[in-house]
Curated annotation (Swiss-Prot):
Coiled coil: none annotated. Induction: Produced in the A cells of the islets of Langerhans in response to a drop in blood sugar concentration. Belongs to the glucagon family. This is Glucagon-4. It comes from Huso dauricus. GO terms for cellular component: extracellular region.
Length: 31
């Protein structure tokens, strides 16, 4: 398992995680 692959997968994971948190933040009325 190369370091590049790990970094790429981790970046995708962080993007999905932050996107979900952003949606929750919008739902909560940007409090």
């Amino acid at each position: 398992h190369s370091q590049g692959m790990f970094t790429n997968d981790y970046s995708k994971y962080l993007e999905e995680k932050s996107a979900k948190e952003f949606v929750e933040w919008l739902k909560n009325g940007k409090s």
